[in-house]
Amino acid sequence: MTKLNEEESFLEALKTRKKWVNDYLKKDYRKELFIPQDIYDGVFSYLRVSGKVLRPSVLYFSCGAVGGEESLATPAAVAIELFHTWTIVHDDIMDRDKLRRGSKTVHEEFRQRALDTGKFDQKEAYHYGVSVGIMTGEVQHGWATSLLSELY
């Protein structure tokens, strides 16, 4: 196998595992509990534009390397992705980042939504955006913990 074929094969393997993670996220019953709508939108904002899902893929590959059925590792893989995502949401707040992967950060998106209502001044809109961002991360953290607690 050539180096290019190996790289293509690896990227295809990553796509497959990313699909497993995304399919699980779409079907998990817990997402119906994420209310109000702003929290739901915040929880899924980074997950919709996620990268290669490397961390969960490492878990899948490790499972397969020791003879396990990779797809059975999906709840743990999803928990890893959620855990990583909530730390990014909180990191963006701490660093006061306004963009992530070319899109607005969670807290910036909700700051802007608050301003767009015409009911918030700059200070209150900023507070609202940060509050939704923190709650978004906390919901993702709880979701990850819930998935891990069901593994045994």
Task: Spell out what each predicted region is.
Residues 1-29:
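N-terminal amphipathic/basic leader segments beginning at the initiator methionine
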Residues 29, 33-152:
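Mg2+-dependent prenyl diphosphate-binding active-site environment of isoprenoid biosynthetic enzymes
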